[in-house]
Amino acid sequence: LDLIEEYGTDSLRLFLSSNISPHSDIKLSPNSLDPYKNFMNKIWNAAKFINLNFESEGNSKEDSFFDAWICNEFNILLDNYSQHIENCEVEKASYELYHFFWDDFCDWYIEIAKISYLNNKDDELLNTKFRMKQVFCMYLNLLYPFAPFISLELHDVLNKDSKFFNKSRELYGFNSAKQDH
């Protein structure tokens, strides 16, 4: 219970799901939970950035190169995640979630959006506002089984009038993933 109080339930759940593998024991120590606590902070900070800087949703007009790129990367994540869940490879599914969010969404997409935001490129920002929130909400949908508390909290913050948990990727206009990047 002390670990849950210090690191959070979602951090512990994600740690456990990431370290499940057949025929092996999980070595649980406070230091092993640090990356997952940091990951929950990263998710929270991304939501805060989206909520503060992208208050209104834009129109889904023509995607910029980077908007199309993040949609494609999300579709790759979704395909891999679905396959891993089908095959009961929970640790691989959580690995995919972790690396998509940290590497693709935060380290690339949000950083590129910040440049457009700071340069006041309104034409690019209109669609980026829409896509960023859309991809983030769909990501939270996938994260929900692993980290339900932060997923639900951020759902309430970002989608007061929306029911994103009931929407499929077809409703969002996502097509099949293109693996040729």
Labelled PLM ranges:
Residues 3-181:
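Helix-rich, typically C-terminal accessory recognition domains appended to large enzymatic cores
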